[in-house]
């Protein structure tokens, strides 16, 4: 395991650190929770860490802050879609998590699924929806139930489980209010799983799988963050070989997208034992209900030590010497 229980990291070597939190996406509330947790964890380890909210503070302020590296605790648009990553590349400030391209790909569910399919990785069949789409034809092709959701949102925001064809229009309208691109995918009936991955390229490896048991099998925004009724099982209770298969699939999905640092793959395990990839989260939640810290704890890594190691791995797509400097 590249991440360890007691990392030998000198907090002074990390310099002045910015924790980006809040932002302007529909997931702002969750990002504030994640970011404040990360900020407190880093400060408890002696890191010179400071919160920075791009939803309230501008680019000039970020450039003037003098951060030596940044922990991205933003979720959703402008935070994990390549936007802030591109800005930090321009500023030459190393940041946590995936680079510009991998972040943009993973945020776009259509692009992610097409890439996974090209590499032979199992993911539910899907169709893109538009206002003039023949919804009956989509239902006839994909079957019911369907999951209809914005193509570029997270935390189950704007998501609807459609069980009858006459529900399609309302489901589309709900998702389209958040994104111009709406996706419908076949519903996979089975166990809901998630698997964090850390590292990069050939060194990427999976943390333990978590099985999610939500009230009435409805793991929505409310049940993800604001209820204690959802059960998170880690160890997952899966057969050891099935767990290894899910972990291997998560690592493959991570590598295909070009992710680095850390991410979390969401997976459905069909009753016949076949795992299906749903999406990849390149800036996972770090709240009290979040799953990555839970998986880390299962292998003896505390929240604080995990955060410290994510930060220590901050980097850039380009080597600092490759960044343009005015003559």
Swiss-Prot record:
What is one cellular component GO term in this UniProt entry?
Answer: cytosol
Location, primary (coarse class):
cytoplasm
A Pfam family per the record = Dala_Dala_lig_N
Q: Which cofactor does it need?
A: Mg(2+); Mn(2+)
Question: Domain of life here?
Answer: Bacteria
Quick one: which pathway?
Cell wall biogenesis; peptidoglycan biosynthesis
Q: What class of enzyme is it?
A: ligase
Protein residues bound to ATP? 139-194
Keywords, A to Z, come to: ATP-binding, Cell shape, Cell wall biogenesis/degradation, Cytoplasm, Ligase, Magnesium, Manganese, Metal-binding, Nucleotide-binding, Peptidoglycan synthesis
- Which family is this protein grouped under? Belongs to the D-alanine--D-alanine ligase family.
Name assigned to this protein: D-alanine--D-alanine ligase
Q: Origin organism of this chain?
A: Cupriavidus taiwanensis (strain DSM 17343 / BCRC 17206 / CCUG 44338 / CIP 107171 / LMG 19424 / R1) (Ralstonia taiwanensis (strain LMG 19424))
The organism that produces this protein has a lineage beginning with: Bacteria, Pseudomonadati, Pseudomonadota, Betaproteobacteria, Burkholderiales
């Amino acid at each position: 395991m590249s991440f360890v229980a007691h990392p030998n990291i000198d907090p002074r070597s990390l310099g002045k650190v910015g924790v980006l939190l809040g932002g302007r996406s529909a997931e702002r509330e969750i990002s504030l929770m994640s970011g404040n947790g990360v900020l407190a964890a880093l400060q408890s380890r002696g890191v010179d860490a400071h919160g920075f909210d791009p939803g309230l503070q501008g680019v000039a302020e970020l450039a003037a802050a003098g951060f030596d590296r940044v922990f991205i605790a933003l979720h959703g648009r402008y935070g994990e879609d390549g936007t802030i990553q591109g800005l930090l590349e321009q500023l030459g400030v190393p940041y946590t998590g995936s680079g510009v391209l991998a972040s943009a790909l993973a945020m776009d569910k259509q692009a992610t699924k097409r890439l996974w399919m090209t590499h032979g990785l199992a993911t539910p069949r899907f169709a893109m929806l538009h206002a003039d789409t023949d919804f009956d034809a989509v239902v006839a092709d994909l079957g019911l139930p369907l999951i209809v959701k914005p193509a570029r949102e997270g935390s189950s925001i704007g998501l609807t489980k459609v069980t009858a064809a006459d529900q399609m229009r309302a489901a589309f309208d709900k998702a389209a209010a958040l994104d111009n691109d709406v996706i419908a995918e076949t519903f996979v009936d089975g166990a809901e799983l998630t698997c964090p991955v850390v590292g990069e390229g050939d060194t990427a490896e999976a943390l333990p799988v978590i099985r999610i048991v939500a009230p009435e099998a409805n793991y929505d925004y409310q049940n993800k963050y604001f209820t204690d009724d959802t059960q998170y099982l880690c160890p997952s209770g899966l057969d050891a070989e099935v767990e290894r298969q899910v972990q291997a699939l998560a690592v493959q999905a991570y590598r295909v997208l070009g992710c680095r640092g850390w991410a979390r793959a969401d997976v459905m395990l069909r009753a016949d034992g076949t795992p299906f990839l749903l999406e990849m989260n390149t800036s996972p939640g770090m709240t009290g209900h979040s799953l990555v810290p839970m998986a880390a704890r299962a292998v003896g890594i505390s929240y604080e030590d995990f955060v410290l190691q994510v930060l220590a791995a901050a980097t850039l797509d380009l080597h600092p010497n490759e960044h343009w400097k005015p003559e």
